[in-house]
């Protein structure tokens, strides 16, 4: 592995072709910045993940630049569009003229000082291109690309590691992980996003240092875990998190699913962990994050509700409600937004209702279809079935009902309101709400031809109540 040579390996690659319009705009903006830096005599390259993606012939999300220019020199070149948000660390954000949403991070070559908090260096000193790459996390991310001649510069062995699909720390793995403990999770994330195997020394250090992950901010842990779950290999991500020891620290509720038996007649696949793992493997490409988390958490309440009947049958009574409360606590701990928490916990709480769908009253079924979370719930149900018995008949039934019923039939405007009830002498309170709910259920079941029919029913309902 090359880590000490003063001269990099150089590889000429084909010119990069951008497919998507939004990426093309970002790329063109980065090229303009590089052009300005080169024109004024500065060394400057595309760096990091975007170079890795270009080498792998995939499309980067963003384009970062590393340069010999100091932050003040960068600011002087782009006086109206530079934001020195990371000036103390040599980082400048350069925004595109006319579109502030398009921006490029421009960082000065640097050496990092000691990482006293396990997150950021205590200070930096400006350095050479080689010194800059030697402080980076993984070899695949420690590449520079000179766009003037389409040449990749590699001081750390990143190019052969990409070719072999190996994730390897730059230099000493333990040092890299201690510098920034989030790299423990990033190693798992890159492995499952890129389809790489984690090199043995890197893996050993990851396992030894796993306990330090608890010092990282919950929001940053949440974001890395979400990227793992939404990667092409979420089931493998779960296994890597478990095998490394990270799962027991970050998500002990999920770790507890291992060894939790299930009734074999309904779950021939095995314990709850195996079921959850199989479901993760059934997620669609690039899934919605709420769906991915709902899959992970849907059976989180099973260990706490495990019981056996006298005949030995395993039961998990009310596990969906216990699980929803546990999911809420977990998601709150990871600082999810209120909307995300409500959406995901609703999916956990409601996932057992699907088995009853073919026998539901029309009103109950329509209310189910009208839930704002129903699309996620339906996909969760489909994946739940694929993760055990494979019977998708209820899923097909609900898809058919969605096709048969339009939005007005599923969730019509109520024919009656609270004022209608109160004019008949019923005060605001539980009884009023109960009457309106009865009326809406009847409306959903097409019991009323029009509003007048609903008013007639209401009068009879109130009279019968007051006799």
Which residues does each PLM region occupy?
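Catalytic cores of the polymerase beta-like nucleotidyltransferase superfamily
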Residues: 1-467
């Amino acid at each position: 592995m090359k880590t000490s040579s003063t001269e990099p390996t150089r590889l000429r690659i084909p010119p990069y072709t951008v497919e998507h319009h939004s990426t093309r705009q970002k790329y063109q903006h980065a090229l303009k910045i590089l052009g300005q830096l080169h024109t004024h005599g500065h060394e400057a390259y595309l760096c990091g993940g975007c170079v890795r993606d270009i080498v792998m012939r995939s499309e980067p999300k963003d384009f970062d630049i590393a340069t010999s220019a100091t932050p003040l020199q960068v600011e002087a070149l782009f006086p109206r569009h530079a934001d020195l948000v990371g000036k103390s660390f040599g980082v400048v954000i350069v925004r595109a003229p006319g579109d502030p949403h398009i921006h490029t991070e421009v960082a000065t070559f640097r050496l990092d000082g000691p990482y006293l908090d396990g997150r950021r260096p205590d200070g930096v000193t400006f350095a050479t291109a080689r010194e800059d790459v030697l402080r980076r996390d993984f070899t695949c991310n420690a590449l520079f690309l000179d766009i003037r001649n389409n040449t990749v510069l590699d001081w750390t062995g990143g190019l052969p590691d990409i070719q072999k699909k190996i994730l390897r720390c730059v230099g000493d793995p333990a040092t890299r992980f201690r510098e920034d403990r989030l790299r423990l999770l990033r190693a798992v994330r890159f492995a499952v996003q890129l389809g790489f195997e984690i090199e043995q020394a890197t893996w050993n250090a990851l396992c030894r240092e796993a306990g330090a992950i608890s010092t990282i901010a919950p929001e940053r842990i949440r974001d890395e875990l979400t990227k793992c779950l939404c990667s092409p290999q979420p089931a493998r991500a779960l296994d890597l998190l478990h095998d490394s020891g990270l799962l027991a620290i970050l998500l002990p509720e999920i770790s507890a699913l291992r060894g939790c038996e299930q009734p074999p007649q309904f779950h021939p696949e095995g314990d709850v962990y195996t079921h959850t793992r199989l479901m993760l493997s059934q997620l669609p490409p690039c899934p919605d994050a709420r769906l991915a988390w709902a899959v992970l958490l849907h059976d989180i309440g099973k260990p706490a509700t495990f019981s056996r009947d006298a005949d030995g049958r395993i039961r998990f009574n009310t596990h969906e409600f216990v699980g929803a409360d546990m999911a809420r606590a977990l998601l709150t701990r990871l600082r999810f937004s209120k909307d995300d928490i409500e959406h995901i916990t609703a999916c956990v709480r409601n996932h057992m209702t699907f088995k009853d769908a073919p026998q539901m009253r029309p009103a109950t079924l329509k209310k189910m279809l009208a839930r704002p979370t129903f699309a996620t719930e339906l996909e969760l149900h489909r994946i739940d079935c694929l993760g055990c018995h494979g019977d998708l008949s209820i899923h097909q039934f609900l898809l058919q009902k969605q096709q048969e019923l339009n939005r007005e039939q599923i969730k019509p405007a109520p024919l009656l309101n609270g004022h209608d009830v109160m004019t008949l002498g019923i005060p605001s309170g539980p009884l009023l709400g109960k009457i309106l709910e009865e009326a809406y259920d009847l409306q959903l079941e097409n019991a009323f031809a029009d509003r007048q029919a609903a008013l007639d029913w209401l009068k009879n309902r109130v009279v019968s109540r007051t006799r």
